[in-house]
Swiss-Prot record:
The active site is at 25. The lineage of its organism: Bacteria, Pseudomonadati, Planctomycetota, Planctomycetia, Pirellulales. Belongs to the MsrA Met sulfoxide reductase family. This is Peptide methionine sulfoxide reductase MsrA 1. InterPro entries: Met_Sox_Rdtase_MsrA_dom, Met_Sox_Rdtase_MsrA_sf. It catalyses: L-methionyl-[protein] + [thioredoxin]-disulfide + H2O = L-methionyl-(S)-S-oxide-[protein] + [thioredoxin]-dithiol; [thioredoxin]-disulfide + L-methionine + H2O = L-methionine (S)-S-oxide + [thioredoxin]-dithiol.
Amino acid sequence: MPFDSEIVEVKTRPGEEVATLAGGCFWCTEAVFERMEGVNDVVSGYIGGKIKNPNYKQVCGKMTGHAEAVQIYYDPSKTNFEELLKVFFKTHDPTTLNRQGADGGPQYRSSIFVHNDEQREIAKKTMEKLGEEYRDPIVTLIEPATKFYVAEEYHQDYYRRNPNAGYCQAVVAAKVRKFNRNFGDKIKGSGK
């Protein structure tokens, strides 16, 4: 249980909303959503744990209970929370508990961190609709969006800055290709 289970308000610019999603390694999730039309910014960080100000070593050491997650700042006139969730579910495996590929542990859990009751309802309905598309049950959690801790600078825009790194070539690039294949009309600058 997080040390603080109350939803924390996030400051956004006028005309902007925020979604907080955890779908395995934040490098992957960030790389996918940075390409999506209507998304203004994506920030990698940690949420849902039991200590304040966690760092990467602590989170990966499974000592904090935090998930690697991203905060997605988006323009609701160009996209919406349900569309973000559709991309989220199609670009990671929501049926594996605390695991995405070779990455295992609670920090890699699949979670939707909701900022309000409307997001909670949209998340539930989207999971019900998409659940029929999977052979195994969806294990994605719906959790309150507690305090989000921005990850260390070297994690931000990791794929964009390190496209030739081994993990990026082996794992992140595959997620980006999946996004491009399934959501070509949602790629920034696609004109659709």
